[in-house]
A protein has these predicted regions:
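Active-site-proximal alpha/beta segments of enzymes that process anionic O-linked groups
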Residues: 1-115, 217, 230-233
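Substrate-binding rim/cap in mid-to-C-terminal beta-strand-loop elements of soluble/periplasmic
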Residues: 6-8, 12, 181-222
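Metal-dependent active-site segment of extracytoplasmic phospho-/sulfohydrolases and closely related
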Residues: 143-184, 191, 215
Length: 234
């Protein structure tokens, strides 16, 4: 399903929801399969996450403790440096989303202060705007424009620091602001890569399950046997 939590777990484990078991946003627990965080940490690397709290629940510990888990630095943990938000109280009139520039700055801080080897930044802004307004509208045009400008200010800094960058999404969305099904507009989304690797042709249709093994391969980390999808960057 093109549901957020299901996609989060698949992006990092490289297995479908039917295998990792996260089948809805309400069905959450610490997943059992190896994931990007666990494998990078096992290989001696440092990881960082600036994301919704679901990522902490799936890849560190469930349930999420609002006080203890909002920020942590754990040298021995799968997520070495975590900075999270919950969006508690979210509804169509109050999105409860942090400013994206704050998230970009926080991830950049982790790269500078802790020299993380792998980091993920997750924002719900465009998803929430789509749910509220749909897509063919001035509000969404401006949201995409604003996000683009914020990202443009940080992307060169990450590249100058030696990082390869993948910009993508967990799912698509209909013009009514819905996702969760199997229609192309719910499942298809863009992927942009900034780095030295060679990738497929621009119109290639990739599988979301390819992300985890591809990221590990770029980091020089052994890919676990559970991640069976083909690496797409060389």
């Amino acid at each position: 399903p093109s549901t957020s939590a299901c996609c989060y777990a698949s992006i990092h484990t490289g297995v479908p929801p039917q295998v990792h078991g996260i089948l809805s946003n309400e069905n959450r627990f610490r997943v059992e399969q190896p994931d990007i965080f666990s494998e990078v940490s096992k290989a001696g690397g440092k990881t960082g996450a600036v994301t919704h709290s679901y990522w902490s629940e799936f890849f560190r510990a469930y349930p999420f403790d609002l006080v203890e888990d909002m920020e942590y630095d754990e040298p021995a943990g799968p997520i070495t440096h975590g900075r999270f938000h919950t969006m508690t109280g979210y509804n169509l009139k109050n999105q409860m989303t942090p400013s994206d520039v704050d998230l970009f700055a926080t991830l950049t801080m982790l790269t500078k202060r802790h020299a993380i080897d792998y980091g993920i930044l997750h924002t719900c802004t465009l998803d929430s705007m789509g749910h509220r307004f749909g897509h063919d509208c001035h509000e969404m045009d401006h949201a995409c424009y604003a996000m683009d400008g914020m990202l443009a200010a940080f992307l060169p800094r990450w590249r100058d620091a030696g990082y390869e960058v993948i910009v993508t999404a967990d799912h698509g969305q209909t013009d009514r602001g819905h996702h969760g099904g199997h229609d192309d507009e719910m499942q298809d989304f863009a992927l942009y890569y900034f780095g030295a690797a060679k990738g497929p042709e621009a119109d290639t249709l990739l599988d979301q399950l390819q992300l985890a093994p591809t990221v590990l391969s770029r980091l020089g980390v052994e890919i676990p046997s559970t991640m069976k999808a083909k690496v797409f960057l060389r």
